[in-house]
Design a protein with these regions (language model features):
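A generic secondary-structure signal
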Residues: 93-97, 171, 223-226
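Acyltransferase donor/substrate-recognition loop-hinge adjacent to the catalytic core
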Residues: 122-210
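A conserved beta-strand-loop-helix scaffold within acyl/acetyltransferase catalytic domains
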Residues: 1-77, 184-257
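Acyl-donor binding region in acyl/amide transferases
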Residues: 63-144, 251-257
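A broadly tuned preference for mixed-charge, low-complexity surface segments
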Residues: 50-57, 97-110, 127-131, 154-169
Length: 257
């Protein structure tokens, strides 16, 4: 882990600490239930046994027509600039592994996208898969964080002027969400439980022709384990007759930089 951490630090990539990193593998539902040989990833070492390249492979599971399909999520694909000509060999090893039905990448940037396209990978067929919606709760803090991130040094008075101008210009958009009144029975959960499993069983039958990630409580609690344990995620669920009929996972982000 420490050598991989050195590699990610050199390339300005953040990863989990050692405990959470190991937990991702140890608590994976597929690896816990199946006694199979699974490669956690592949490495490139230099002459001094330093790790100069890495690609991880995480087991995942999706459903289609009520049939489970086991796949591998490519993660943490990083290679030092001097050894980037070996990058494709890591990719080749990743997609050639056995015991999987498909491979998927969920966090590709523009550079990764170009490399994947060369291997005939296809984008997820969802038009708005890379769009995000934000609810701004503290405009002043966002403005201050943006100026710090851009290394723009301003005085408090100027920041306040920017804040008030922005608030006036974007008043309707910033306050649009406030007009909605909740009349339904909504409950906030900190983790998935059996109620969500009942909802998932109905969902996969109703949408059986959609390729969907296994949304059982076991899989999602694993997938969001770090966020739940650090209080960075909540589940807002709507219920009728003590049954969940819909929910939304909210990831909390507080940027101070």
């Amino acid at each position: 882990y420490l050598k991989i951490k050195d590699l990610t630090d050199r390339n300005n990539i953040e990863i989990y600490d050692k405990f959470d990193w190991e937990k991702v593998w140890k608590e994976n539902p597929y690896l816990k239930k199946n006694d199979i040989k699974w490669f956690l990833g592949w490495l490139i070492e230099d002459d001094k046994k330093n790790i100069v390249g890495h690609i991880g492979s995480l087991p995942t599971q999706y459903y289609y027509n009520s049939i489970p399909y086991n796949g591998a999520v490519m993660s943490c694909w990083i290679v030092d600039e001097k050894y980037r000509h070996y990058s494709m060999e890591l990719m080749r090893r990743n997609i050639a592994q056995k015991n999987i039905d498909f491979s998927i990448v969920t966090s590709a940037n523009s550079k990764t996208e170009s490399a994947l396209t060369a291997f005939d990978w296809r984008k997820i067929p969802v038009k708005k898969y890379n769009e995000k919606l934000h609810i701004i709760l503290n405009l002043k803090k966002i403005i201050d964080s943006y100026l710090k991130k851009k290394n723009i040094n301003t005085y408090g008075l100027i920041n306040n002027i920017i804040f008030y101008l922005s608030y006036i210009i974007f008043f309707k958009r910033i306050n649009y969400w406030k007009k909605f009144k909740i009349k339904k029975h909504v409950i906030v959960y900190n983790k998935f439980n059996r109620k969500f499993d009942n909802f998932w069983n109905k969902l996969k039958k109703f949408n059986k022709e959609t390729f969907m990630f296994n949304r059982s409580s076991e899989w999602i609690n694993w997938h969001l384990s770090h966020q739940f344990e650090t209080n960075k995620a909540i589940i807002v669920a709507e219920e009728q007759n003590d049954e969940i009929i819909g929910y939304s996972i909210c990831l909390l982000k507080n940027v101070d930089k």
